[in-house]
């Protein structure tokens, strides 16, 4: 049996081989196609034709986007050339007039010498035509420049306003947060201070009394300093003392941890001290009214200082020994009774002393009387007695 060999290439392969071997004489040999980078395409392919068409269209078309303002100005110029020229002339003339009057006002050539007037005329004569030509011939250029400058300025100002508003908002926000934190920290600090002071005063009653007394003294000195510039009388002294004690008690009321019995004790001592001071003031004013006497400023200060010292002493003594002011009338009565009893005993002793002196004098008289009796005996009786 005879083996037959059949070719493995198809008709498509033969066609492609034929096309590859054939060379178009008009178009020339095909360039080699680099399939790696894809930058080179066959010049006769459909893709190459499309790219070439698009590039030609883009090269012949406009490269810039037309400005609407420029288009409108160009349409107005084409449709109304006379009006456009008249407008250019009017703006140029107005610019020249503005330059001329500005120079006239600033220089004022009428007050200058002849040389100054000539120099002004020459300068204006050269400047005004230059301004007129520059504005009239380059009208479109400088109008576009001015419009662009205005646009850039407006955008810049808008950006500045925006940035400033954002910065102010951030500053306000940061400031508000900072102030809120400051208030919070201050409130917490004051609360802790009040708590520490209240707990300390609650745990130490004696320190509480000393603290109250010192605070009261400081407040009294402040009040006396405030009223020192005016005329100080007894009423003001009583008011100062009352306000000082009230301020001290208000300081205590702020410390809410103090027991109620301590507050009750303080109020009771306050009213007792005020009662004693009121009695002193009433008695003093009554005596001054009866004797029609007037105290000068130094006397008022002495009286106020006395009330201040008495009030401090009584309040401090009442806080140290509860009930001392309540027992004071009885103590004063016992003291007066003891004083009067001592006076009576003293006068009795004096009377007894005078009685002893009288007895001694009587004995002396009796002695003198006995001596006189012995001198009256007769001489015969004396001789008989001697013989016996």
Swiss-Prot record:
GO CC aspect terms: ascus epiplasm; cytoplasm; endoplasmic reticulum membrane; vacuolar membrane
Function in brief: Promotes unequal transmission of alleles from the parental zygote to progeny spores by acting as poison/antidote system where the poison and antidote proteins are produced from the same locus; the poison component is trans-acting and targets all spores within an ascus whereas the antidote component is spore-specific, leading to poisoning of all progeny that do not inherit the allele.
Region annotation (Disordered) ranges: 1-39
Record field: transmembrane: 89-109, 119-139, 152-172, 182-202, 207-227, 243-263, 267-287, 297-317, 331-351
InterPro entries registered for this protein in UniProt: WTF
Keywords, comma-separated and alphabetical: Cytoplasm, Endoplasmic reticulum, Membrane, Toxin, Transmembrane, Transmembrane helix, Vacuole
Biased segments, Basic and acidic residues type: 1-29
Protein name: Meiotic driver wtf13
Family that this chain belongs to: Belongs to the WTF family.
Tree of life domain: Eukaryota
Lineage: Eukaryota, Fungi, Dikarya, Ascomycota, Taphrinomycotina
GO BP: meiotic drive
Subunit and partners: Homomer. Forms protein aggregates. The two isoforms can interact with each other and with themselves. High sequence similarity is required for their interaction.
